[in-house]
Structure formats: structure tokens, C-alpha cells
Amino acid sequence: MGNNTESVATKAAKIKDLSKVIRVDADHLDHLLAEDAARIIEIISEEYQVILAAHSWYSRNFLPRAAARLDIALISDVLKIEANNIYTRAIYAGNVHARIQSNDPIQLLTVHSSLFEPISNEGGNAQIIIKDAPLPLNLTSWQSEKINKSDRPALTDAKIVISGGRSLGSEENFNNVLSPLVDEVGAALGATRAAVDAGYAPNEIQVGQTGVVVAPDLYIAVGVYGANQHVYGMKDSRVVVAINNDPDATIFQFADYGLVAYLFEAVPEMLNLIKE
């Protein structure tokens, strides 16, 4: 869905074991407003029994609208697909896993893609099917966007994520203490909601239930206490390292390795050791 999607569709067609790619292209889909995306899903759903998307900011915007148009339930936060209509999903900020059975004629899901093994982007030869886009609903209009460019890897793609909490105390400390370590190891920079709310870090790097969900090979939590909504966003990391001067910090319950130390001493020392 979108405008000028030919190259994306061609790339998607190479995914192994994929049989077809549906391409819906139109000028008015340049920014793909949520209500237009929901309408397209509604139309396409006539041919399918299961529709799923990665659990992301965008899917959480348009799929609930699509579910409402189809008069079915959206099953979000899916962690495991057990059968054709039985799923395990996260509730209560990931503290509880619920087993859900849906009897809707169409299964509409968002899944945590980081929990599933990636498939090959080569070797496929899917058929590309072009469908006409419905007329715009014109319920909302696009105003503007601001793209923050960074040489660092995206949070969702990074093998290493280093996140800072409110204990850093200021935006200056966030940049001066964490950034050198982040850049030295080629990591992505994350933040807790408390740090974002305090103005220490931008909203787009917030890790947690109301932010980005990550599952890197290594997650380093610096000055992070371990609120439920933050843990929800990083608990599936392969290895978790926590640095906090409070030995009772909740984050240590989820850490593979914990260091009880003042972050302003531990992080520079860690950086020096890595450089050596």
C-alpha cells in the first residue's frame, strides 16, 4: 500500500515461499493515512482468512480501524501462534500471557516479529497482483513530518541496544555519558519512558509498552529501575546487562548480568576497557 511501491513489491516478491504480493498504489496513498489503509485491508480481507502485521506504531494505528470496519476483534501483541485460531498474547504490560481463541471469520493479528525466525529475502518468485486503490476517505489530511536522521542502527534492527533511565539526570548526561559507549560498540540508543517524560531523550527512542519493542542480542540497561512498561519492551532480549546503584532495582530480576554501581563511574570505565 502506498505511492510508487513498485520497487518494494519487487523486493517482497523475492521472499522465499511467498506465493503472491498484492500491490495497491495511488497518488493519494503517498502518506498512507490510517483510515485509507484500513479501507484497503477491509477490501483485501474478502479473499483471506488471516491477516497479520508486525506489532508496531503504524499497525496499532490502522488495524483497529480495519477491525472495526469488519466488525471483528483485533488480536494484538501475539507472541505465539498455536493453531489456526489459537494464540498466545501479552497482557498487563507483558506480565501475563493469555491464551486466546478467536471464532471470527477473519483472524486479524499483530505479532511481535522479533520472536519469530526471519525468512530468506532471496530465492522467491512471487506473483505481483495489482489492485485498484479505493477513493480517499478524506477524514483527515497530511500536514507535515519531521525525520530524525541518525548514523546509528534503528532500535528494531540493532544487535545491541543501550538504554538510559531517569537516573542519568539530564539530556546532557544522556549525550555525554551514554552516546560515546553507544557509538563505540555500534549500538542503538534507547530510553525509558521516565527519561523521555523528563525531557532527557526524544520520544522516538523510547523502549517499552508505549514505545518500541526490541529483542536484540545484547540489551544494556543503564540507570533503569525496571518499570513494568519498560520491561515489556525489552524482556525478549537474548542477553540483558543491568547497571544500577540500587541493588533492589527491579531490572536485576530480568538481567543475565547485573552490576551494582554508579553509572557515572561504571559506563566510562566500561568504555575505556572496550577501547583497550
Language-model region placement:
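N-terminal glycine-rich FAD/FM-binding segment characteristic of electron-transfer flavoproteins
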Residues: 1-276
